[in-house]
Amino acid sequence: IKVILDGVYSHTGSNSLYFDRNRTFGGNGAFCTRQSPYYNWYTFYEWPANYHSWWNFDTLPTVNKMHPDFIRYIITDEDSVVAHWMKLGADGFRLDVADELPDEFIQLLRQRIKGINPDALLLGEVWEDASTKIAYDRRRSYFTAGELDSVMNYPFRTAIIDYVRGHDGGKALK
């Protein structure tokens, strides 16, 4: 059995330790104090209540993925999130909304994961054809730059389901 963890690095929950909108974790989150060690992870338009969120869901504040503090915490520190779980035996990560992560972030993540375990899997959630994906006016290099080992193949999944249900007369599989 292999253990693949779901890495959500584009946003956090509004009630996470890092944001703590409901003050569940003692009020040290970015929503509670500008002195929070996590404050720079987020973009506030008018602190605290007006902030950038994933697809405008206020329960999912977006993270500044390339902020040095976030990079250290997630990837590069000795006991970063990635290193911690890899050392405990995780066999890799599935990247939630990989198309919303900068290529540079994915490259750093891959270097760290493969540095700990060269056989670890880095799998991306990409809803469209990942080989031709353009996100934020930029062609993604998931495969051409070797960023990801694989992706969730939703177009193929849809074709199989449509075929089994008899919805496309087999066109998707030709």
Predicted regions and their residues:
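N-terminal structural segment of carbohydrate-active enzymes
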Residues: 1-2, 12, 17-20, 72, ...
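Glycine-rich, aromatic-flanked loop segments that form ligand/cofactor-binding clefts
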Residues: 1-12, 32-44, 123
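A structural motif corresponding to the C-terminal end of an alpha-helix
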Residues: 1-3, 84-91
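Active-site-proximal helices and loops of the catalytic beta/alpha 8
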Residues: 10-11, 16-26, 81-83, 91-174
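Core domains of carbohydrate- and sulfate-ester-processing enzymes
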Residues: 17-64, 157-174
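A residue-identity detector for tryptophan
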Residues: 41, 47, 54-55, 70, ...
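Active-site cleft segment of glycoside hydrolase catalytic domains centered on the general acid/base Glu
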Residues: 51-71, 98, 102-110
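Short, acidic/polar
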Residues: 67-87
